[in-house]
Regions:
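Bacterial Sec-dependent N-terminal signal peptides
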Residues: 2-35
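First exposed extracellular module after export/assembly in secreted or surface-exposed proteins
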Residues: 26-136
Length: 136
């Protein structure tokens, strides 16, 4: 009886192990430059302001993924992230898209915004930078 149970267990273990590799879609997340038509110079405390950001999807296989948003005291670093299927042959895209950053200030004072625009030759990120006052 022990031999039968042992044989069944070994058979189940061997059948359940597979060497198949999932070659499903593989995705890449990239940051793309942000362009602002205008930036508000004042915000009201505890109210939500939408800041429209324009960006270009690099290929026809790319799609909006996320708004990168980092808070550091009064500085806000913002970037647009896109996702791309890296296993497809993709054509270059020139269509401009828009996404809005919903900003709600939490204190009265000056906020400093940094919107990502590129990485320079030395590998350092560069930004469009704006200051805005929060009153009342």
């Amino acid at each position: 009886m022990k031999k039968i149970i042992f044989t069944l267990l070994i058979t189940i273990v061997l059948i359940s192990c597979t060497t198949d590799v999932d070659n499903g879609p593989q995705y890449q997340i990239n940051t793309v430059p942000v362009v602002l038509d205008a930036f508000p110079t004042k915000f009201a405390a505890d109210s939500v302001t939408e800041i429209p950001m324009k960006y270009v999807l690099p290929t026809n296989c790319s799609d909006f993924y996320n708004i990168y948003y980092l808070k550091n005291v009064n500085t806000r670093t913002v970037a647009v992230q896109v996702i791309k299927d890296s296993q497809k042959n993709c054509a270059t895209n020139i269509n401009v898209s828009t996404v809005s950053l919903k900003f709600k200030p939490t204190f009265i004072g000056t906020y400093h915004f940094k919107f990502w625009k590129s990485t320079d030759a030395a590998g350092v990120d560069t930004f469009y930078e704006y200051d805005a006052e929060v009153t009342h």
